[in-house]
């Protein structure tokens, strides 16, 4: 069984872009109103009842091997409780964490059939990571907004403001996957297991699939091309809930190379009992700073151009913060700036969330 991490905080695996994007999402005009409206329309009970009626719940007497893997993941990440786990009939290799106050996890049958035990463990770690990072509420809301169809037209926010909120939620949603991939690695503690799962998700099935070649493909995707290619890559992601598998592999490799993964394995990690108030400016500033440092190390053409042109991502982020607060960049911040608050497939029947 992998090493356990008692009292580990989700901050240990959260990608700085995830935290920064979530903070930015909360600043989008109309976001609070969208949350209130969707919460008024959504109910956790129907989601749970439909899943209970249409899928198979995992337990000691049902999928006992899968249940044992799941219990190990919960212990490894020191989850405070067991979240119900279901397997639903769907050949697509995928999984998802669903719900609000009482989340649960759904594995597609294709995931159980196509992955080995270690890879299934990594998928379970990914989903538990989403829950422990408090991603599930917003993810459930986003799937509802994307699938709401005509129901959304009855909402007073329908139109451009709502589109802006959905676009911001999609951007955060993609970044949240990078955090969950790190939790996935902590759950299985073998980088090649997570890489293998990403390879299979991208189409690498059968004995001929090669992790080393796929990592080289990821490197070529990230480094190759011009700044225009980077724009094309960005546009290609706009309507996707997940980054491309090669991007996820590259991000995971960078985290490993940074030494942060080994640091956690050695027992040095932030503790849940010491989690800061996420509403503080210091917390957001730390996320922006970490994200900016990642861009400095990036081989992406746009990031290279920004460095060569002397454009600092951190400065841009600070400028955005000033704009959010309605303050001119030239104004001197108040003495108590740091104390200011930051201010202003969901369901088992489809491809959900790996």
Q: What do the PLM-derived regions correspond to, one by one?
A:
Residues 61-66, 73, 77-79, 157-224, ...:
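Short helix/loop segments within enzyme catalytic domains
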Residues 133-136, 188-189, 240:
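Residues in soluble alpha-helical coiled-coils and helical-bundle/repeat scaffolds
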Residues 135-166:
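Post-HEXXH active-site segment of zinc metalloproteases
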Residues 2-140:
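Peri-catalytic and regulatory segments of divalent metal-dependent proteins
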Residues 54, 157-179, 312-314, 318-338:
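Low-complexity, charge- and small-residue-enriched intrinsically disordered regions
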Residues 1-48, 186, 196-354:
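Cytosolic-facing loops and C-terminal tails of multi-pass membrane proteins
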